[in-house]
Regions:
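Polar low-complexity intrinsically disordered regions
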Residues: 1, 15-21
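A sequence-level/structural motif corresponding to short, flexible coil/turn segments enriched
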Residues: 21-395
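Bacterial N-terminal signal peptides
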Residues: 8-16
Length: 395
């Protein structure tokens, strides 16, 4: 009798359509074009302040910022620096709606650059900033009100060419990360400024081949810096050709932890990190290129992760969104792009994929993914001719 009951139970499980149903694939919706804001050679990126879009970059070798509305109508335009050459390369918006922009300018005339006293960590094969900006040795921060008024400009002179890559802000100030060139190659750096824009001590990360691509400011005063490295960092050796790195820096500016993400005979880079430690990056092994999207805990333990065929660089926003240029099918999506196509994915708190939306073909790179209270979720892309902003909200 027990055997018959067991067989009956097993049979009911085997033939239950609900128990054995394959998970439903996610449909991919179209992203809607909001507006285009300039050309790729003049636009570094876009952030949102209230209902305005803040476009920043360099035009005619001069750093600038300007605001447009969702139709592309210009609201204000501000030249940030009067030097012969200057660049604006990263931006963030604080809770008041003020815009903090990071870039680089030449050293003040007659100023002797200080000898850096870095906190060495070791680097990755970062490209040295090009010779055309060879005299840009001052890390520069600009703060602008939402109405386009320049509140302050401050600089941190260094002894090498610098290329800021990201900035994070909170009520206590700002943190800028980037790449600095030297005779060995390149290193990453972290520069912090207080709420008045006054810089503190520069922290150098590595010495010959490291990048610092994104930064998170934590409430305890510590920092998380992510990027890549192909050298030993704080005793942690390289496992692949280049590893993605997650670096903990204390309030006292000491490197306290390094976590490496590697691929055998491959290259990994963490391109972005949200404040919730949702990281986006690229994985390159031979001719295979993928986007990696991983949610980490506060101790840098991965809680969930995905890989998708792509052109590489991946941008994250909040705890739920990631965007990249997709190049292939995924078993989770009703999706089979014939050409590289922008793709925005959304996840729930447990890491389940909950939604997807795509932009038009012809886009070469995702410059950013933004979450705006007023404008919703935005994706910034660049094509050969224009930088465009897309939204999930139909217009």
């Amino acid at each position: 009798m027990k055997r018959l009951l067991s067989l009956a139970v097993i049979a009911s499980l085997l033939f239950s359509p609900l128990a054995q149903a394959a998970p439903k694939k996610i449909s991919v919706k179209p992203l809607q074009l909001l507006t285009s804001v300039g050309t790729p050679d003049e636009v570094s990126g876009v952030v949102a302040s209230g209902s305005s879009l803040i476009v920043f970059g360099s035009k005619a070798s001069k750093a600038y910022a300007r605001a447009v509305d969702t139709t592309g109508k210009e609201l204000w335009n501000l030249s940030l620096d009067q030097s012969a050459v200057s660049i604006a390369t990263a931006a963030a918006v604080d809770q008041a709606g003020d815009i903090w922009i990071a870039g680089a300018t030449p050293l003040a005339l007659g100023l002797i650059a200080p000898t850096p006293s870095p906190t060495p960590l070791n680097p990755d094969n970062a490209a040295v900033p090009p010779a055309t900006i060879g005299n840009l040795q001052a890390i520069t921060i600009w703060k602008i009100s939402a109405t386009g008024v320049l509140a302050f400009t401050n600089t941190l002179p260094t002894s090498s060419v610098v290329l800021p890559t990201a900035i994070a802000v909170d009520r206590n100030g700002a943190s800028i990360v980037g790449i600095t060139g030297n005779e060995k190659g390149s290193a990453g750096f972290l520069a912090n400024a207080d709420k008045a824009g006054t810089f503190g001590t520069l922290v150098q990360i590595g010495s010959a081949s490291t990048t610092a691509d994104s930064v998170v400011r934590h409430t305890d005063g510590s920092f998380t810096v992510v990027g890549s490295s192909s050298e030993t960092l704080s005793g942690k050796k390289v496992a692949g050709i280049t590893d993605g790195v997650i670096i903990k820096i204390s309030k006292g500016l000491k490197i306290t932890n390094v976590v490496r993400s590697s691929a055998v005979k491959g290259k990994r880079v963490w391109n972005s990190s949200s404040s919730t430690l949702l990281l986006g990056g690229e994985v390159i092994v031979g001719k295979k290129i993928e986007s990696a999207i991983t949610k980490f805990s506060s101790s840098y333990a991965p809680t969930w992760t995905y890989r998708f065929p792509s052109t590489g660089p991946t941008r994250t926003a909040g705890s739920t969104y990631a965007a990249f240029i997709s190049t292939g099918v995924s078993p989770l999506l009703n999706w089979n792009p014939k050409s590289p196509t922008p793709l925005l994915l959304s996840f729930d708190a447990k890491g389940a994929l909950t939604g997807a939306a795509s932009g038009p073909v012809g886009q070469k790179e995702v410059l950013g993914a933004l979450i705006s209270k007023e404008l919703g979720v935005l994706v910034v892309t660049s094509s050969a001719a224009a930088v465009s902003i897309f939204t999930l909200i139909p217009r």
